[in-house]
Regions:
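Surface-exposed amphipathic alpha-helical tracts and adjacent flexible/coil segments at the periphery
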Residues: 1-212
Length: 212
């Protein structure tokens, strides 16, 4: 159409998320989880959420858990009538994260952040300042008295060298404790059992494999 998109990421696809349509998908014999070039924690998280949705249905807790690993926001895809113009996130090619609060202002050499979701020490966040990202790992988290804390639920204070403004939106891109849980799941020894295979292969005949 001749439109200019500047430096936008035209091939940056949103993540396909059909968990709210799990009842429509149950008749399919096998669901493929897209994990190419994704970290093990991403695959573990998505498989776990869809497995639980298939067995027990889904709820808001499971929907929010999906957001805690890599995503470029979500699309329901062509199968469920998504507008073709809405399947890409042209603003960014990397992890979008999920919103957890806003910058309220500066206070004693730190920035005060009003939280809508819990923030833990060692979480990784990004702050949208004038359409530019400020990314940091929360190595130190403070309360209003300047005391170090491990987590905050409503208001916290962080030392950030970059300039920020009141109203800048804060996103969490990595939940430290959530990832520790996923890593523990990945480290578990899965049950192993013996399997006897007999393979029959003859020229011009179909390959037959018997498993016992």
């Amino acid at each position: 159409s001749g439109r200019s998109y500047g430096t936008s990421y035209l091939l940056s696809m949103k993540d396909l998320n059909t968990i709210d349509h799990i009842e429509d998908l149950k008749s399919i014999d096998s669901l493929k989880i897209e994990g190419r070039m994704k970290e093990p924690a991403y695959v573990a998280n998505v498989v776990k959420r869809y497995r639980k949705a298939l067995d027990e249905g889904t709820d808001q807790v499971e929907r929010e858990a999906l957001q805690k690993t890599f995503n470029r926001t979500y699309t329901e895809g062509y199968m469920f009538g998504e507008d073709p113009g809405s399947i890409t996130n042209i603003q960014r090619p990397n992890n979008f994260g999920y919103e957890i609060g806003t910058v309220r202002g500066s206070f004693k050499g730190m920035y005060e952040i009003a939280l809508t979701k819990t923030l833990h020490q060692n979480d990784i966040i990004r702050i949208d300042h004038e359409n530019e990202d400020v990314n940091l790992s929360v190595a130190r988290l403070y309360d209003q008295e300047g005391k170090l804390i491990n987590q905050a639920d409503d208001t916290c204070y962080i030392k950030i060298k970059e300039k920020l403004s009141p109203g800048d939106v804060v996103y969490k891109t990595k939940d430290y404790l959530f990832y520790k849980g996923l890593d523990a799941d990945l480290d578990k020894e899965f049950r192993r059992f013996p399997l006897d295979l007999k393979v029959y292969a003859y020229p011009g005949a179909a390959l037959v494999i018997d498993a016992e």
